[in-house]
Amino acid sequence: HQNSSIAHHRTVGKVQLLEDRMIAEKPKSKLGIAHTRWATHGEPSEANAHPHKSKEAVYIVHNGIIENYVELRESLINDGYDFTSQTDSELIAHMLDYFIKQDNSMIEAMYLAKEKLNGAYAIAAIDLNNNSNVVVARNKSPLLLGLGTDEIFAASDPLAIAQLTNDFIFLEDGDVASISAEEYKIYDASKSKVSRDITHIDISNQATSKGEFRHHMEKEIYEQPEAVL
């Protein structure tokens, strides 16, 4: 929100349910994170849905699997953190909060967390106490930036934001980026600020639409013969 608070909404089921809730509240903000979850750790439930939060201050969304989440979870519990979900993702929020409380910035906290995390992940995080940007990180899981007009996006796939922009920056493994509506900064695995190429991709509306099919999986099945050719 513009009043330095975070509107936190989660639903189970169709994305339309979340859209309806957001439309009803009409939150005013210049930044946000969102996520559609394929359940790997924990059942499909509102408690297991993203974004996950820590201490009402750090909020994250995460794609991928944290392989050493059991030991990291136990360590954070010993440090006084309470878990409210069954997911491996929630520990990322607590870990970032832990490092931020040691006088690290969100970017510094993300690098410290990366040293602890084993597995594949694409992460986007917001710190309520420094909510001018979103910090993202990639390791073995797709993550890209989308450059719009007075707006910048992060996503796992170009199709997710194809209706908003055709200009993309594909982040590399180890990259951490800070993004706001006005600018983006990318840092590599060695914490050096770097420049990544901008790729222009024209994606048709047909590629993002379900068309006559009931869902995207059905569409992909019927498109396989053409894809193979």
What do the predicted segments below correspond to?
Residues 1-216, 223-229:
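Conserved short alpha-helical segments that host acidic/polar catalytic motifs at enzyme active sites
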